[in-house]
């Protein structure tokens, strides 16, 4: 296939549906016979899986959500390279010809997770899948954002603060590291950050009102959080 727009569209659709797989919900049902949407924040991501179903389910959710994001990029990258853009695309993609294509695919995977068609277009908040796509896209930025997340959570004990810091840091890091990348790539990285921040709107409200739950590896919840 030598049509970049058609190839990008196909890869984006596939990535959207891969990103949409609700591993947190599936694992909660398999290991705990629990619908994690019915307790805690009601979210299907790692943090709520930890609060409702425990560390094992949370760890597997984190791993699989990261992997599904990474797989989308690892599959798409050689396909983009085969278009004939040349050697740099097959190695890095950021800052090279066709960089916008992987940007669109990154965005599609994150949107699939947040707006899962398997769950009536409700889903997670995009942090783990976002980490997966960014690590596969350009791992130094991914590791930098992971470090920022860990430091923010260690200081505040709020996972949401770390998530927001990483989301805001993504477009800044992408522009700083690849200032000459395409406008399309910059736009996609910005949209990932904006969407993840939007997905945390309830957390932002709780942080402002002092109702946000701090990270705990032992405390379990069985009822929905107060709004």
Walk through the language-model features, giving the residues of each:
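Interfacial segments of multi-pass membrane proteins
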Residues: 50-54, 76-79, 108, 125-156, ...
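A cytosolic-side transmembrane-helix exit/cap motif
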Residues: 122, 146-150, 182-189, 206-213
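Interhelical loop and helix-boundary elements at the membrane-water interface
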Residues: 2, 18, 23-73, 114-127, ...
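Loop-to-transmembrane alpha-helix initiation sites
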Residues: 143, 159-166, 181-192
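Alpha-helical transmembrane segments of multi-pass membrane proteins
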Residues: 15-18, 77, 108-113, 149-153, ...
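Long C-terminal subdomains/extensions of small-metabolite kinases
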Residues: 130, 177-178, 185-186, 190-198, ...
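Helix-coil boundary and interhelical linker segments in multi-pass alpha-helical membrane proteins
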Residues: 1-10, 74-104, 135-141, 176-188
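Alpha-helical transmembrane segments of multi-pass membrane proteins, especially transporters
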Residues: 12, 16, 61-65, 69, ...
């Amino acid at each position: 296939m030598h049509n970049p727009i058609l190839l990008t569209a196909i890869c984006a659709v596939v990535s959207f549906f891969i990103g949409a797989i609700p591993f947190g919900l599936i694992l909660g049902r398999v290991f705990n016979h629990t619908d994690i949407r019915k307790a805690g924040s009601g979210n299907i991501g790692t943090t709520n899986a930890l609060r409702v179903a425990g560390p094992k389910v949370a760890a597997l959710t984190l791993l699989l959500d990261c992997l599904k994001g990474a797989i989308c990029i690892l599959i798409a990258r050689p396909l983009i390279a085969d278009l004939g853009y040349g050697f740099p695309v097959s190695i890095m993609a950021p800052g090279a010809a066709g960089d916008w294509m992987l940007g669109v695919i990154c965005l599609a995977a994150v949107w699939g997770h947040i707006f899962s068609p398997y769950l009536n277009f409700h889903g997670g908040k995009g942090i783990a899948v976002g980490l997966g796509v960014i690590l596969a896209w350009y791992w130094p930025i991914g590791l930098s954002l992971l470090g920022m997340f860990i430091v923010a959570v260690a200081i505040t004990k709020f996972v949401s603060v770390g998530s927001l810091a990483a989301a805001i840091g993504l477009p800044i890091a992408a522009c700083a590291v690849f200032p000459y990348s395409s406008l399309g790539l910059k736009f996609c990285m910005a949209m990932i950050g904006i969407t993840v921040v939007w997905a945390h709107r309830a957390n932002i409200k709780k942080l402002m009102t002092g109702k946000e739950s701090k990270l705990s590896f032992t405390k379990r919840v069985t009822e929905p959080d107060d709004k």
